[in-house]
Amino acid sequence: MANLNLFLTILKTAAKQNNHPIPPHLAALTESRTLTETDDLNAALQQAGESFDAAQCGCLFANLSNLNIKDGRLQNRDLKRESVKALRIDVRDANDVVEAVKTLIQTPEYFQRPEDWDLFCAGPLAMAHADQEFTSEEKAYLERYVPDLKHIEAGAKIVKEKTPSELGETLAELSSRQRRCLAAHSISIMFIDGSWKGSEQEFLELAIERMRIVQFDSDRLLKGLYTLFNVSVFS
């Protein structure tokens, strides 16, 4: 419980400093809690580094990164540097996490035309339905990113009309940056509800193959986004 409180205190403080909301995937941890802040974020990071295990340190770093990027750029480079040091994060792992998070945040740069947003929604929706279930967490995640909910309806229609293979071929026509971004969101949808099934993994592998995402990129995205959403290490 002490580690969870420290985790949330650090994130609440960083969110306020960088003018970010607390992201929805932390809702289950923050329910019925009054989130506090710290006057000394660096000291709190040092305490976390001494108290947390490796998985908890990684999760904290990933979620700090999620609150430290705006318009595709780091807002506070000192925060990244201090958190890498205090939490004992390997520099290469840190860069993988930051790149994965940046890929999600840069979505509005890559998807601008209405028809592209329709396809954007189709990918994560197909992933969400791969286990025959569309959870409230998955729905809230998708709604957070789209500029208009009508694109979700259009994406659902695309999913209904196409087989997974046909959908993959359609998504393959997007630009390389769009495909990589879409792969990141599909991975996030797989992790967002705290559990994933073999059917989701199979769909993801098919989608990555059809969208021609290289193994190096998909591995980096998987590692970074799993670390971001693996908040169960604090439960």
Q: What kind of region is each of these model predictions?
A:
Residues 1-235:
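Small-residue-enriched hydrophobic alpha-helices in membranes
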